[in-house]
Amino acid sequence: MFENYDKENMFESIWNFPNNLKDAIVLGNGIDLKNDYSHINNIVIAGMGGSAIGGDIVSVLENSNIKIPYTVCRDYSIPGWVNSSSLVICSSYSGNTEETISAFHKSIERGASICGITTGGTLLKLLKENKKDFIKIPSGLQPRAAVAFSFIPLIKLIEKIGLIKSELDLWIEKSIDVLEKKRIIYSKEGNENPVYQLAQKIYKKIP
């Protein structure tokens, strides 16, 4: 029934979220850094939309583990204090987000260290041309459905650099187990589905 309304197939994206978490862990564990980051004393995540949300999730999950200033920047510019001791991580699913590309160029001007997370596009080209470390994530998803690939590789990257010691793997393992069980319950049609029951209760009502 829901197929008539789910034109962008978000059901499949949500169903696959536990699988994406597993794939993102594998991807993050395989990071191979070429550059030196031993001098870094602050981190900026430059991104928009789902990519910026990934940065927000990291801030919440690792708040007590990150021992240096950490901020998410949703803008064409970057904070005025960014300098050669800063790490700017440019995150754009498409690789063509204007604000993120602009932040990349401004980070170059400031002499900041730069890493990137993207599927390709202009950002990947710039990262390669400037010999910056990057994580290439899977394409073919809607950006808002690619959250697993916007926050897990980000945590793994910061951990690989040595700026945090995360317990992400244990947390994700438990989360995957819960999600795999819940997706079966929440994918049923009709009154067996608690989400369907809730929808019926609030239908034509203002919460």
Regions found by a protein language model. Give the residues of each.
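The first (N-terminal) embedded transmembrane alpha-helix
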Residues: 13-20
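Short gly/ser/thr-rich secondary-structure transition/capping motifs
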Residues: 23-30, 68-74, 189-192
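Short, non-transmembrane cytosolic segments of multipass membrane proteins
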Residues: 1-5
